[in-house]
Amino acid sequence: MNTCRVWAPNAREVELDLGESRTVMTRAARGWWSADAPLGDFDYAFRIDGGQPLPDPRSMWQAEGVFGKSRQVDHSRFQWTDQTWQAPPLASCVIYELHVGTFTPRGTFDGVIENLDYLRDLGISFVELMPVNEFAGSRGWGYDGVALYAPHHAYGGPAGLKRLVNACHERGLGVILDVVYNHTGPEGCFLPQFGPYFTERYRTPWGPAVNFDDRGSDEVRQFVIQNALMWLRDYHIDGLRLDGVHAIFDQSAVHILEELAGAVRRLEAELGRHLFLIAESDLNDPRLVRPPEAGGYGLDAMWSDDFHHALHTVLTGERDGYYEDFGRLADLAKAYTDGFVYDGRYSAYRGRRHGRP
């Protein structure tokens, strides 16, 4: 038998719904529930306190979309051929970012595979996939995902993503995956019905913040960390680009980004291949990429928005919004050499100093 587990700390009763049968789950410590389940692939849902069937927060496959049942996946069944693959160092790489749904007319992982030779011949080093986890519907940028463990069914699901990563590695191309840990989408998100995945302590542009330091946050932190490790371990992804870390709020003694980086370093040692984390941040804070022993979080790289903004304003002359702070060739030169234009300088757009040396 297999064991299904789910975290629902506020529930009085949780049932495992297999369609033809329901099983009342057994409560364990810290709000976890468990029940025996069949071996192999099967569809299932959870019912909390007699309510409607809900997909598993850690569902590995939503074959019928975010409102359907979850499906178990045996990751060991896929036949990988990339056992000797090692990603090249980031510092010498060219990254090509693409959106699976619009990169080809097919809008699938297999559609991307058909164009990998073209990408390789361009001279790129990495394919960076915009978020591929399940969101409501079949069209979207991916940044409103709600089933964080499940590759989108319209793109080809778990098997399709594995085929794409394997095909990239066969052609000498690494794979970076965008992941979003600062919010979820507004439609089809059932996480609040299971537990305190969000907190009202902070607000983001998209609503309540993910709960990294409020009551119940230990399990939420593990939910995120295990998600990141799953992409790297089970899908052979080489690195993750962390969306908008300036909207990840955490006043814990060990910040979630530092804890995540430590977990990735341990997985890297276990697997024997290089893994990395890239931050997107508008804070201009070099502590993101400093090692923990130097007071940093230990990430491997971060996007330089200042370089983009400086180049954009030089080429276009646009000065609206945050582009107000840029527009000189000297800004572009400083962004190129130092990483940041605003490293503690006064920002007219913000009306205060911005960044850190």
Regions picked out by a protein language model, each given a short descriptive name:
Residues Y96, L177, A279-E280:
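Short glycine/serine/threonine-enriched helix-capping/active-site loop
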Residues L257, A261-P357:
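Conserved alpha/beta catalytic core and glycan-binding cleft of carbohydrate-active enzymes
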Residues W7-V14, L39-D41:
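Short proline/glycine-enriched turn/loop motifs at strand-loop junctions of beta-rich domains
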